[in-house]
Curated annotation (Swiss-Prot):
The keyword tRNA processing does not apply. This is Pre-mRNA-splicing factor sap145. The lineage of its organism: Eukaryota, Fungi, Dikarya, Ascomycota, Taphrinomycotina. GO terms for biological process: mRNA cis splicing, via spliceosome; mRNA splicing, via spliceosome; spliceosomal complex assembly. The modification Phosphoserine is found at residue 145. The gene is sap145. It comes from Schizosaccharomyces pombe (strain 972 / ATCC 24843) (Fission yeast).
Length: 585
């Protein structure tokens, strides 16, 4: 048995080896697998086509069988079985009958009548709407009346969508220009707004800030300037005139030749004064030759490509510059080339107040009418030789309009009040009040000096009616000098050069408090002393005062006036300061 098993084992191994070799031989390449797949796909498509043909044949045969059975049933009068299965050539089919004739005397029919009615088809067929086609009118009788046209138009509007209706009802650009106040503000997209007339009214309103042009652009803002090379910044002409550009170039050339070590050293310790320009050149550049830069005006908004547009603000209609005359070849004293067209068609309607010589105003002196070279054409007149567009002959005298209206206020709305003007007005009012008070004090002192030398009876008569603020104008004093005497006095040589101020002992208060303080006498402190001395002098030496009245009383009077003026000025300053604090923003 052991020998038989050993003999069988090598045989099995040989069989395995042979099978492995056969598998390797039968292994297909990629191209073979691809070809087999294509072959299978072709077989599937062919089989599907054959199956479809077979199904169509079976379907035709089934319909023929159904028709035959329907005709047989109809001939026999048996319509009770509406769904019946029959078999023809092994095929099972169902016959469907359109209508069934039932016995009206059957009681079950009354019960199931509603059920049967639900399965009945409606006899009325739906009318399919024909496509809209143009109508051909062969006679006047076929013309629709107004009511029929409105009904037809209403029917057509019901068929249209909302978007198409909006487009039909939309105003055209020409109509909007005719209805607007200024046709030049109308743009082609204004007709699609909610209220085109109101939009054009807002755009035509004076001093209206326009909407930027890039509001309807679908691309990014300033994306059109990506490929444009920007110019380098150039200094203004008045700065270039100082010669600083040449000096900077020379300095840069010297720095280019310097070694790296020296450049690093100058970065740490730079040398100053390399660009030394004359002060007079700098002064003239910035104070004499400086020009105003181009700035965006009020109401202007930047848009893409604004810097590339021509600036026409400085240009005025009707003014022909010398450059334009040279470009058009207009000789001196000759008319412009568009004059003949204006004489024929009229002046431009956009400029109704523009004066054009030869159209609505006289031609210049030395010019002649006619169509010869240098002639100014034919004056625009009617059949009665009357000017059409204006005083082309210069016969009408200019009218001088008298200024009968109210004066125009030049003050801007919303302008802040100037406190200086208010202070000046207050000063004027205070001065009006000051002078009478000063005159009162001066006159009172004069009366005191005069009363010292008069008898008592005369003084009582003088002061019988007291002097008040309201009747101060009744007092008249002659030969009163209110100013101090400019001549040097006799005691000028005995005056002290300076005065020693007494020092006060104070405690230091605060972070920056003073350590020393001095007692400085003011005018208010000296005033009572002078008044006491004056009263003592008037009581003791009345006769001496009367004799020396012309020598010393004028100086004291001027001092009293100055003290009173100081008091009034201090009160006025305090009042204005309180007003400033009140109206301070």
């Amino acid at each position: 048995m052991a020998e038989i098993q050993t003999a069988q084992n090598p045989l099995k191994e040989l069989e395995k080896i042979l099978e492995r070799n056969n598998k390797q031989k039968n292994k297909k390449s990629r191209n073979q697998v691809r070809r087999e797949k294509k072959k299978l796909l072709r077989e599937k498509t062919n089989s599907g086509a054959k199956l479809a043909e077979k199904n169509s044949d079976d379907k035709d045969q089934l319909t023929e069988n159904n028709d035959n059975l329907y005709n047989d049933k109809k001939s026999n009068g048996n319509f009770y079985d509406t769904n019946k299965t029959d078999s023809v050539d092994g095929m099972v089919y169902t016959t469907i009958v359109d209508s069934v004739e039932l016995d009206p005397n059957d009681p079950l029919i009354e019960q199931f009548k509603d059920v049967f009615n639900r399965f009945k088809a409606d006899g009325q067929e739906k009318d399919f709407e024909d496509t809209d086609k143009g109508q051909i009118m062969y006679s006047d009788d076929e013309i629709l009346s107004e009511g029929e046209e409105d009904a037809l138009q209403k029917q057509q509007e019901e068929k249209l969508s909302k978007k198409k209706l909006r487009k039909l009802k939309r105003m055209t650009v020409a109509q909007l220009k005719m209805l607007s106040e200024k046709a030049d503000v109308v743009e082609w997209w204004d007709v699609s707004s909610l209220d085109p007339l109101f939009l054009t009214h807002l755009k035509a309103y004076p001093n209206t800030v326009p909407v930027p042009r890039h509001w309807n652009q679908k691309r990014d803002y300033l994306s059109g300037q990506r490929g444009i090379e920007r110019q380098l910044f150039e200094l203004p002409s008045y700065i270039r005139a100082t010669g600083i550009v040449q000096m900077r170039n020379a300095v840069h050339e010297n720095e280019a030749d310097m070694p790296l070590r020296q450049k690093m050293r100058e970065r740490v310790q730079p040398k100053m004064g390399k660009l030394d320009i004359d002060y007079q050149k700098l002064h003239d550049a910035f104070f004499r030759y400086q020009t105003k830069p181009v700035l965006t005006g009020f109401g202007e908004c930047y848009f893409e490509g604004k810097e590339l547009e021509a600036d026409v603000k400085e240009k005025r209609p009707g003014d022909i510059s010398e450059e334009l005359r040279e470009a058009l070849g207009i000789a001196p004293g000759a008319p412009p080339p568009w004059l003949f067209a204006m004489q024929r068609y009229g002046p431009p309607p956009s400029y109704p107040d523009l004066k054009i010589p030869g159209v609505n105003c006289p031609i210049p002196t030395g010019a002649q009418w006619g169509f010869h070279p240098g002639g100014w054409g034919k004056p625009p007149v009617d059949q009665f030789n009357r000017p059409l567009y204006g005083d082309v002959f210069g016969n009408v005298k200019p009218r001088i309009h008298a200024g009968t209206g109210s004066p125009v206020s030049t003050q801007h709305w919303g302008e802040l009040e100037e406190f200086e003007e208010e202070e000046s007005s207050e000063e004027e009012e205070s001065e009006d009040v000051e002078y009478p008070t000063e005159e009162i004090t001066e006159r009172e002192t004069i009366e005191e000096y005069q009363s010292a030398s008069e008898p008592r009876s005369q003084r009582e008569d003088l002061h019988a009616e007291p002097l008040t603020y309201f009747n101060q104008s009744n007092v008249e004093v002659d030969n009163v000098e209110l100013r101090k005497n400019t001549q040097p006095s006799s005691d000028a040589a005995n005056r002290d050069l300076y005065q020693v101020l007494p020092e006060k002992s104070t405690n230091i208060s605060g972070f920056m408090g003073p350590q020393h303080q001095y007692d400085i006498p003011t005018a208010e402190d000296t005033l009572p002393q002078k008044r006491n001395a004056h009263s003592m002098l008037s009581s003791t030496n009345k006769g001496d005062v009367a004799l020396n009245q012309s020598s010393n009383w004028q100086d004291e009077l001027s001092e009293l006036v100055s003290e009173q003026a100081m008091k009034v000025g201090a009160a006025k300053r305090q009042k204005t300061q309180s007003k400033r604090d009140k109206f301070r923003l």
